[in-house]
Design a protein with these regions (language model features):
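N-terminal leader/linker segments that initiate helical-solenoid repeat arrays
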Residues: 6-58, 62
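Terminal, low-structured helical/coil segments at or just beyond the last alpha-helical repeat
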Residues: 11-14, 21, 186-226
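Conserved structural position within tetratricopeptide repeats
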Residues: 32-36, 65-69, 99-103, 133-137, ...
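Helix-start (N-cap) detector for alpha-helical repeat units in TPR-like alpha-solenoids
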Residues: 41-42, 75-76, 109-110, 143-144, ...
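Canonical tetratricopeptide repeat
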Residues: 46, 80, 114, 148, ...
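Register position in tetratricopeptide repeats
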Residues: 53, 87-88, 121-122, 155-156, ...
Length: 226
């Protein structure tokens, strides 16, 4: 993980507190209104969304269960509950929600991506890789799909394949720093020092402070000593 300067950390903490307070205020207001309109799907979805942002998974699931009791084909309800079930490590339930969602909206990008990543997390490795490969076939211009496959390959130690996929993701979304950072990490792991230096220079030109990249430079120096 990249280090963050102390001042930036303090500012980030302050912003997070203010944001959490605003979310809690919105949540409290929605809860009060919901007491008078218990069958409002829209209100329950809004409340669940705020619960999710506050990482209150059980509360979010309760509201999403009620949404889907009222309308078992509600697309937003299925998508959010799949996400929440995954966070609660209820993988089989999450998988079922994604599968039901794909019955309603065949080929949906987010549902297919969520299902592939869930299968990877739940060690259904063949299904995960087949799923992400199918997604890329359907959405060949999606940087997110290539990055997701790169992430899977990186976790499995398939570094050369992962490097290719992150490079492809970067070519499709040149301004995404996360893709570039993962790509640099892979280049260093593969011993491709000059390529890594080139990518680091590109990040600095895009405004990233050199101090935030010091861990990468340290790793490159360590390679030279070996």
């Amino acid at each position: 993980m990249l280090s963050m300067p102390l001042m930036a950390q303090q500012n980030h903490a302050s912003d997070s507190k203010a944001q959490n307070k605003a979310l809690r205020d919105s949540l409290a207001a929605a809860t009060n209104v919901l007491a008078y309109h218990p069958d409002s799907i829209d209100l329950r979805l809004k409340k669940a969304a705020w619960n999710i942002q506050l990482e209150q998974w059980a509360y979010a699931k309760d509201d999403l269960d009620k949404v889907l009791f009222l309308n078992n084909t509600n697309i937003a309800g299925l998508f959010y509950r799949a996400f929440v079930n995954e966070k609660m490590k209820r993988y089989n339930f999450a998988r079922l929600d994604y599968q039901n969602l794909l019955v309603l909206v065949p080929g949906n990008f987010q549902a297919q991506l969520g299902l592939a990543l869930l299968n990877e997390k739940d060690k259904h490795y063949t299904e995960a890789y087949d799923g992400i490969n199918n997604l890329i076939e359907q959405y060949p211009d999606s940087a997110m799909a290539y990055a997701a496959r790169g992430g899977i390959e990186k976790e499995r130690g398939m570094l050369e394949l992962a490097e290719y996929d992150y490079a492809k993701a970067m070519s499709l979304d040149e301004d995404n720093q996360d893709y570039r950072i993962n790509h640099i990490d892979l280049l260093i792991s593969l011993g491709r020092k000059q390529d890594a230096y080139t990518e680091l220079e590109a990040l600095i030109k895009k405004g990233v402070a050199p101090g935030q990249l010091q861990d990468f430079y340290r790793r490159l120096r360590d390679i030279r000593r070996k």
